[in-house]
Amino acid sequence: MSFWDYFRSNKQATASVAKERLQIIVAHERSQRNQPDYLPQLQQEILEVIGKYVKINREDIQVQIDRNDDCAVLELNITLPE
């Protein structure tokens, strides 16, 4: 192995890592793009209603919409204090 081959192989490994990271970012952006525009507002309103009865943070509620062929499921995960 020559001196130049050592540095060249490192660039290939770096390129593959960068490509993998970019694929993850693109997949995340695509999944966010499919969510409806009203989802952040819905999450805020749910937080306000629950906040009337229990003190929770915005980070304690997660709203997600899963779509299948002909069905959409709204999933709420709320971490309530003990």
Curated annotation (Swiss-Prot):
Function, in words: Prevents the cell division inhibition by proteins MinC and MinD at internal division sites while permitting inhibition at polar sites. This ensures cell division at the proper site by restricting the formation of a division septum at the midpoint of the long axis of the cell.
SUPFAM superfamilies: Cell division protein MinE topological specificity domain
Organism: Hahella chejuensis (strain KCTC 2396)
Gene of this entry: minE
Family: Belongs to the MinE family.
Cystine residue pairs: none
InterPro entries to which the protein is assigned, alphabetical: MinE (IPR005527), MinE_sf (IPR036707)
Biological process according to GO: cell division; regulation of division septum assembly
Record Gene3D superfamilies: Cell division topological specificity factor MinE
Cell cycle listed as a keyword: yes
Keywords associated with the record: Cell cycle, Cell division
Matching NCBIfam families: minE, PRK00296.1, PRK13989.1
The protein's name in its UniProt record: Cell division topological specificity factor
Keyword Cell cycle belongs to the record: yes
